């Protein structure tokens, strides 16, 4: 069996070792059998001379919540940046809503219904909260406008209180809320969060996860990377574990959370 392949079954899939007897690929119950929103096959990517991704296969269904796990340096952020077009894949295929997206620019991929909140937030410090939000507002890929400025401000009361403040006047947690709110105003089909809670105060972290849960409940698919694996697994349907740029385990998040041997082996916890 190739390192990134899983066979059909009820549990998780591990390519070897203590968990190697489990087989299967989790599918969100409500969307089992639905055409994938995103499908990547055989993705390879490099940074300079370094070969980072080695034949990654990943699919995400409509409304599915997926947690991307692995130790630091295993390729999680590179995979996300490759999916968004910021890193050019050296080989493989990428389809978003059935459209070939491998050669598209990041803005073109975003127009297909993907929204990305990177590490570092990327807000505009000289624009107000209102301006930061409104510059991103648009209808979704199917024309819907479920997430409006009013809905984002209701979800993030702190932003409503600072609506006229410049981005540079916000705390780190408020800037992260602004970045997520701006992404939601694109009315995405898939929201990708890369280390959304890193370095934030615990009460802000709780607020971020509350919003992640609300986004999931609204039917938007999510792909989440975060160092707090317990929170990731508690807010997702399925886990995908990377090691050295390869998928080494995929299965239900609840299975991963209950498997201490798996967590020790691949996350070092």
Give the ranges of each region predicted by the language model.
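ABC ATPase C-loop
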Residues: 183-184
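ABC-type ATPase nucleotide-binding domains, specifically the catalytic core motifs of the NBD
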Residues: 48, 66, 104, 129-147, ...
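Helix-to-loop junction immediately C-terminal to a conserved catalytic motif
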Residues: 84
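Conserved ABC ATPase signature
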Residues: 166-170, 174
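The feature captures the beta-strand-to-loop junction immediately N-terminal to the Walker
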Residues: 69-71
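Conserved ABC transporter NBD signature motif
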Residues: 6, 23, 92-100, 112, ...
